[in-house]
Amino acid sequence: KGKYHGLPIYEMLGGACRDKLKVYCWIGGDRPDDILRQAQEKFAQGYRAVKMNATEELHYIDTYDKVDAVLGRVAAIRDALGNEMDIAVDFHGRVHKSMAKILAHELEPLRPMFIEEPVLPQNNEALREIAGHTAIPIATGERMFSRWDFKSLLSDGYVDIIQPDLS
């Protein structure tokens, strides 16, 4: 209908609702020593948000040494750049529900922008419980491929950000 009327679809849906969009830059995280340097480089380039891999694969119940390592990586950025840099933490589904609840709770004082894919999509029912243990927004969706995969996430409201992989 947009082509027929010679209008962009967003105009047919009521018009533009914003003229800016916040973007983030991926900085890795598999090499913890590089995290702070990369975040500082992105900040110098004008980015005000980064996403990082702060976790390695964790056991169902793991040690607080590993939790502290995650906190240390995120805290290094927060301490160096303050609240001017938003930090998203991608779990890549490497974490089981029990550890995801602990990590989300422990990360709260560092004020992440969001946590991404705390569990794999096959375990999306765990997101409800994880969401109940944190105020941090939860993002997921890059490994979900149909509208039916997203239906319960949207209707139940326990995910704040959906990230379909359009490629």
Which residues fall in each region the model found?
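A short acidic, amphipathic alpha-helical/loop segment
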Residues: 38, 126-129, 152
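Glycine-enriched alpha-helix->loop->beta-strand junction motifs that scaffold or abut catalytic
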Residues: 46-48, 81-83, 105-113, 129-138, ...
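Catalytic beta/alpha-barrel core
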Residues: 51, 88, 92, 111-121, ...
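Beta/alpha (TIM)-barrel catalytic core signal, keyed to glycine-rich beta->alpha loops juxtaposed to Asp/Glu
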Residues: 145-154
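Short acidic active-site motifs
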Residues: 99, 125-126, 148-149
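N-terminal capping/lid subdomain adjacent to the active-site entrance of alpha/beta enzymes
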Residues: 1-87, 94, 98-101, 105-109
